[in-house]
Amino acid sequence: MPGRAARRRISSPAVSRRLALAALAGLAVLVVLAGLALPAPEAAAARPGCDPIDPAHCLLPWPNDHFRKNGRIALRDSQMPRNKDGRPVRAADYNRSDGFSPGQMIVTRVPGLDLKRSRAVPVDDLARSFAKRAPIVVIDARTGERQLIWAELDAQATNPRKRALLVHPAANWREGHRYVVALRNLKDRRGRTLQPDRAFRRLRDGERSTERYRDIFGRLAKAGIRRRTLYRAWDFTIASRRSLSQRLLSIRDRAFAELGDTTTGDLQVQGGAPAFTVDGVSQLTPDVKRVDGTFTVPCFLDAPGCPPGARFRLDRGGLPVRTPGNVQVERFICLVPDGAANGRPLLFGHGLLGGAEAVLDLAPLAAISNFVTCATDWSGMSSEDLPNVLDLSRDISKFPSLADRLQQGFVNFMFLGRLMIHPDGFASRPEFAGKIDTRRLFFAGASQGGVLGGALTAVAPDFERSALIVPAMNFSLLLARSTQFGRFADVLYPSYPDQIERQLLVSMVQMLWDRGEANGYAWHMTRDPYPGTPRHTVLLHEAFGDHQVANVATEVEARVIGARLRTPALDPGRSRDRRPYYRIPRIRSLPYSGNAMVVFDIGPLRTGGLGTPASPLANIAQTRGTDPHSITATAPAAAIQFSEFLKLGGTLIDTCSGRPCYAAGWAGPP
């Protein structure tokens, strides 16, 4: 213990000041040392090549032309998200694209943001995209036209400090177009205006200038957006049609050329039929026979037989290289009604990670509507692919194997379809002879079969009419909103624990997934057909409140393909939206021969758990009530619609007596 003299010396003002200064100096040293040991979040954006305007992650804001150079995506492995083992996602596959996805989800981080106080456009009021003072705006850089969008905070994130702002296109971005994003006058929960980070503030206020940002600010000014109001702004460019489709169109054309058909798209069967075998026939029901067999398809992946996990090997032009003689032998299952005479050939696509056996559920429809219905596995997303899907959820660098095998799967489906209408195909066998009308093929796909079936429809040479049942597009939009996502999130989320990176990853992989699902081909599904491809007409069937395939994604697809809505779609008050089905035009009269969307409803939540509420506004799945996903398509009114649409000269007819279309025993409000 110090004596009284010592205590007096310590308590003197001069000594106290010296001790205080020493303590502060020591504290400063500790802070510096701590900073060296644990970098602040802003350090991520300070790495070489990062965009400093969003310090939450090197690649934010995303998508972003900061990461596009000389007309190509230009990412580095060092910038990419890392899994729990420290392995970065490999950038090479992304760098083969000349732009971002047509459905690319915008991801950025805005600390303290309150979307309601900011009056940002929500998913249930899309018209606010065009409000004069909208705080979140996306414009076409060339025309200045506002884009239809909605904004949300990531409800999947449990850490508020890692909660990303997500902005979705409510009608896809156009191929090859450049867009500018503007965040302005953003508010916190107390209504205070948020201030930008230093890096963007310097650009905005003219302390630092680049040619790119002079152009961005100029285009925003022409669109009526004042520079001084900006919190953050940047640009991004969408991939071209060629970048999105050239691989699939190349393997399609080369595969059919091997059959001797070099003029696909004229709806004329030319050349030979694919090789096939019939391995078994059984009586499935009193009215329908089951026929099992195999067929052979050229394999364009890098392993013999095109197994799960195999990938394209690309040449210098970016096209898949085929190993001479490599083939895939795929199975098929067909349903042949016993009483069929010239039955309509219907190609069917199964649901999530399922298999060809799903076609067996269509036996009643086949018998009643005289459909000869055939299915195969969706290579890339079938039950056989499940181990690969789980494996790539642990290491996203393996994701190209899924997207590449999906494209091989489309060729498989097209070859099965050709067998159904070729005179030397199934019609040459006694199991099918006289029972199949080879004039024209039709397609129906349910759930995943509707998502992948949209892409197939866009490139298919042998059918013109397609029914997509509880479909959508853009897996990056669908995943978090689906009850099916949980089993994959249980693998993905522990592998990528950073909650900001999860949404970034989901958005990023859409660039690869585009080549294997409808999102990458949607602008050509019903109009502006690809070379060697006929024009297609599509019927979309939406189950209101779907727990597995989010209605918002189905409605984005409807806007892109130009589908008109059959009305009345719902009873008054059933939708959560201020203006339901905004910017989806209505069908004026029935019958209707064009692209259409029909909504089926099992009714609101009621006693016994029957019915379902409208989908949640947030990016989470609906778990209350009964899931209508697998119910509505079996409604007699739906089956009759499909049958009348999927025929030569087919149309959408009114099977709902001028009321909303109901299912599962729901007959409408009293």
Residue ranges and their predicted role:
Residues 419-480:
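Primarily recognizes the serine-hydrolase "nucleophile elbow" in alpha/beta-hydrolase
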Residues 45-279, 286-298, 305:
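Acidic, low-complexity Ser/Thr/Gly/Pro-rich repeat segments typical of extracellular/periplasmic
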Residues 263-339, 344-345:
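Domain-level recognition of soluble alpha/beta enzyme cores
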Residues 159-184, 188-189, 325-363:
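A conserved hydrophobic secondary-structure block that centers on an alpha-helix together
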Residues 303-330, 341-432:
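Cap/lid segment of the alpha/beta-hydrolase catalytic domain
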Residues 3-26:
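Bacterial N-terminal signal peptides that target proteins for export
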Residues 22-37:
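Bacterial N-terminal signal peptides
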Residues 405-408, 467-670:
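C-terminal subdomain of alpha/beta-hydrolase-fold enzymes, centered on the catalytic histidine
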